[in-house]
Amino acid sequence: IGGGPGGYEAARAGVQLGAEVILIEENGIGGNAVLTDVVPSKTLIATAEAAQRVASAAALGVRLVVDGKRVTPTIDIDLPAINARLLQLAKSQSKDMLETLEAEGVTVVNGHGVLDGNHHVLITKSGETSSERIEAKTIIVATGARPRELASAKSDGKRILNWKQLYNIGD
């Protein structure tokens, strides 16, 4: 249960060891690491570094020339475009990971899994209300992290953002 880094690697290892593997994930393969944490934050860092390199180019002896005339660039940060790019990169990596799992023989279920005893899982596929009960010799729970909300500082999506909301803000 869970398709983040831990669940992803466990599923691949299980198949390589000859097991029949079902991976249940409701938000996308790669989990928060790929979709809302590592990939997006590294993309933001790389974008900020690129803007800084352009801004400091003249101090390093690099001059920008347009139509034979030196120009001093104005750095303009387009946050909606940056967010769209980083979300696209995250979705692309998630899709690649899904394709890898499927190519290796993992059955991926888009849905929610709940333990039902020692050797059973109730699977509710996304968009459905009924559950299917499956039996498993081994169950790995790798459900990852969730943003912690403090009673005194609940995220409202405007003034207080959690790390999942951050990448969907506009201007």
Go through each PLM region and give its residues.
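Glycine-rich flavin
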Residues: R12-A19, I24-G170
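Glycine-rich Rossmann-fold phosphate-binding loop(s) that bind the pyrophosphate
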Residues: G2-P5, E26-N27
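Residues forming the Rossmann-fold NAD(P)(H) cofactor-binding site
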Residues: Y8
